[in-house]
């Protein structure tokens, strides 16, 4: 879907996600693109970025070419500051120590709610998906970035099932449900970068990826999109970003 | 007993008082250990995803034809496939159930859950942790601030929304989970069950304290003197433990921290086979790798020396600079 053959959809997704992370932040990363993007950010001049994994790791520096196959494998602990229990690392989210939660998504809606549990009726699902893992906890307890592939069936008006809460039904509904902290503030896809309206809490396009038109984003989205007043065009991935990324994932486990 | 039923404190104390908690030798064979798990029990499984899975014991439970178990674990991967496909478990209580992020959805889980013959009871990861922790603390529930507002909350009426008596804030009370038996794989323990876990401990300490009995499988049995030289490495104390089994490579084809990484060629072949046909593919896998071998070592030889050596090389490289 990218207009360029310099990089794959997963690669621009990872590069743009890495750009959203700042030195000094504490980032709770899921497996796949989030882990790779956070590791890329560390390698691109943000070594003070602390990565937490739900397997029970604080401050990982994953080795190039040795990406862990899950956030619960020994490779996640390489050069970490601390290893602790899974419940305890999740409690750091609840206490408020973590700046950013960073996840992938299977299905998202206009209020940033994520579904990773059921396609169809939960009592008789068409597809039983893997489930929450730490997703519900991360999205309930901290500010969150979601990185995901942009497809019409994944960007829907209302998800079949809210596994991980965004802004629920918009306005104040998240706070009213007992979730006063956090909330999704960026959604990054291979087509565009999205934010959320401060009042309605509905998703809106902030910037278009290089070579992507507004029509293209709308055509791949299952509901009418709002475009921010000053929609910008994102700078394309630099050679340094792409080369570093390919050094980290030489087998293209997560960036094929 | 349905896994959502919280046991009364009196029952918990009575059951624990009946256990022999003395410092005594508990070493048994894999076959004898599996015999301690009886049909219909709630079984807590240590480790997470592809790490420190007590695979040899799960393998032996399938061989012995155990039935109608309800199994709980923080995150489930191919162990869950085998528990469903091997006819051992009717229900799995967890936060995430697939074969691994590299392979997408588990066709085995989908086949059984979508057909309705097996149940996948989903909680958030933190909820699973606080359920085991409440069980280990001897309290009937703990409050958490996640799952609120999501569709997981109505899906799990066992969890109760609650207004905090101090602040008036909304909280979710998750019920204690006290498994009948916990099965946990560790790097080393002594004959009494003092277990030293290297690396990621996941929810194993809470699980061991919560369960009404604990079976340890261990890469090696060391002397009590050796344990006492590094007591700060002991994560599960002997009085929680009821049986100890020495099973080298007892988490294969999953990983055991510092010793071996997942045996990915075996895993990839497994996933391709069962996802191509979750019934016949699983049956063929079980026939060849579970029912076929005469013992665990023969199973390991079917995985193959080359792959085990490579997984061990990668596993030990954790300690390289």
Indicate residue ranges for each PLM-predicted region.
Chain B
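Conserved alpha/beta enzyme-core scaffold
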Residues: 1-321
């Amino acid at each position: 879907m990218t207009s360029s053959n310099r990089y794959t959809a997963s690669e621009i997704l990872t590069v743009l996600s890495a750009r959203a992370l700042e030195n000094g932040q504490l980032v709770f990363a899921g497996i796949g693109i989030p882990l790779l993007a956070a590791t890329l950010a560390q390698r691109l001049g943000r070594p003070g970025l602390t990565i937490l994994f739900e397997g029970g790791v604080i401050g990982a520096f994953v080795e190039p070419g040795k990406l862990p196959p899950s956030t619960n494998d020994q490779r996640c602990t390489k050069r970490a500051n601390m290893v602790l229990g899974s419940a305890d690392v999740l409690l750091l989210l609840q206490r408020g120590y973590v700046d950013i939660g960073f996840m992938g998504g299977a299905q998202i809606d206009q209020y940033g709610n994520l579904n990773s549990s059921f396609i169809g009726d939960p009592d008789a699902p068409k597809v039983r998906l893997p489930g929450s893992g730490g997703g519900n906890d991360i999205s309930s307890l901290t500010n969150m970035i979601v990185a995901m592939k942009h497809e019409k069936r994944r960007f829907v008006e209302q998800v079949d099932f809210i596994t991980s809460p965004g802004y629920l039904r918009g306005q104040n509904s998240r706070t009213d449900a007992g979730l006063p902290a956090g909330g999704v503030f960026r959604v990054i896809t291979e087509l565009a970068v999205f934010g959320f309206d401060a009042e309605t809490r509905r998703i809106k396009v902030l910037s278009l990826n290089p070579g992507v038109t507004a029509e293209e984003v709308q055509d791949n989205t299952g509901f009418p999109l709002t475009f921010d007043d000053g929609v910008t065009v994102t700078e394309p991935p630099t050679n340094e970003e792409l080369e570093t990324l390919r050094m980290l994932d030489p087998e293209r486990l997560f960036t094929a | 007993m349905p896994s959502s039923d919280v046991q009364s404190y009196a029952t918990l104390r009575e059951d624990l008082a009946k256990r022999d908690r003395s410092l005594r030798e508990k070493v048994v064979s894999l076959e004898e250990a599996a015999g301690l798990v009886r049909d219909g029990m709630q079984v807590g499984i240590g480790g997470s995803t592809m790490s420190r899975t007590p695979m040899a014991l799960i393998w032996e439970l399938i061989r012995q034809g155990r039935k109608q178990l309800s199994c709980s674990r923080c995150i489930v991967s191919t162990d869950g496939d085998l528990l469903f496909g091997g006819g051992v478990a009717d229900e799995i209580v967890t936060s995430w159930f697939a074969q691994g992020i590299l392979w997408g959805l588990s066709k085995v889980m989908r086949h059984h859950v979508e057909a309705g013959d097996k149940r996948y009871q989903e909680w958030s990861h933190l909820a699973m942790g606080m359920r085991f922790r409440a069980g280990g603390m001897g309290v009937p529930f703990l409050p958490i601030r996640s799952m609120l507002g999501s569709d997981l909350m109505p899906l799990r009426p066992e969890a109760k929304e609650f207004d905090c008596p101090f602040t008036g804030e909304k909280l979710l009370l998750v019920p204690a989970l006290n498994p009948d038996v916990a099965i946990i794989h560790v790097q080393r323990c002594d004959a009494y069950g003092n277990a030293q876990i290297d690396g990621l401990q996941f929810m194993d300490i809470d699980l061991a304290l919560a369960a009404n009995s604990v079976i340890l499988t261990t890469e090696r049995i060391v002397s009590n003197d050796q344990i006492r030289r590094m007591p700060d490495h002991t994560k599960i104390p002997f009085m929680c433990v009821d049986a100890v089994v020495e099973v080298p490579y007892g988490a294969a084809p999953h990983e055991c921290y510092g010793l071996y990484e997942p045996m990915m060629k075996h895993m990839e072949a497994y996933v391709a086979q069962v996802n191509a046909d979750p019934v016949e593919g699983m049956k063929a896998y079980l026939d060849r790798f579970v029912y076929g071998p005469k013992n665990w070592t023969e199973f390991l030889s079917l995985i193959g020396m080359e792959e085990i050596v490579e997984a061990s090389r990668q596993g030990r490289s954790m300690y390289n600079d």
